[in-house]
Amino acid sequence: MISDDTDQFNPRDAKSPEIAKGKSAKRREARQMATQALYQRHMAGHALNEIEAQFRVDNDFSNVDGTYFRELLHGVATNQTEIDTALKPCLDLTIEELDPIELAILRLSTFELLKRIDVPYRVVINEGIELAKVYGSTDGHKFVNGVLDKLAPRLREVEVKAHKR
């Protein structure tokens, strides 16, 4: 069972729909917060720890997987060169030409595809699309979907092929 004071998840708990749903909802909130924080970092250029601290003070984290938020935020920053290198072949624009919020979403999703193989690629794509619907431009979700659809087979070839069988 998951307790309120830990972010640990026992796979046996997934049998309980409420627990599994609660975990995924907290992860979705973590992705939303991380997207906003990455956008802020891109626009304002503040230090990562400063942005993280500000988000934790300014926002209610009771429904956020705080550990996952931190992993996403710091993981994207630490692996940004690798992330951008993976993204470039799937883009018709340069990284610099991308809308900053869509860039934040793509970097976050790419990080998950690269480093969080426990998260199914279809979940990563869906979460990226949902983030773009909320925060992106009018058709930003279509753009994000197109890029992630090209990227997933490059980064998760075996998983994508297995799913298509």
Curated annotation (Swiss-Prot):
Annotated region (Disordered), positions in chain: 1-27
Bias-annotated ranges (Basic and acidic residues): 10-21
Gene name of the encoded protein: nusB
PANTHER family: ANTITERMINATION NUSB DOMAIN-CONTAINING PROTEIN, N UTILIZATION SUBSTANCE PROTEIN B-RELATED
Signal peptide location: none
One Gene Ontology CC term in the entry: cytosol
The organism of origin for this protein: Pseudomonas syringae pv. syringae (strain B728a)
Name this protein carries in UniProt: Transcription antitermination protein NusB
Cited Gene3D superfamilies: NusB-like (1.10.940.10)
Entry's family note: Belongs to the NusB family.
Family annotation (InterPro entries): NusB-like_sf, NusB_fam, NusB_RsmB_TIM44
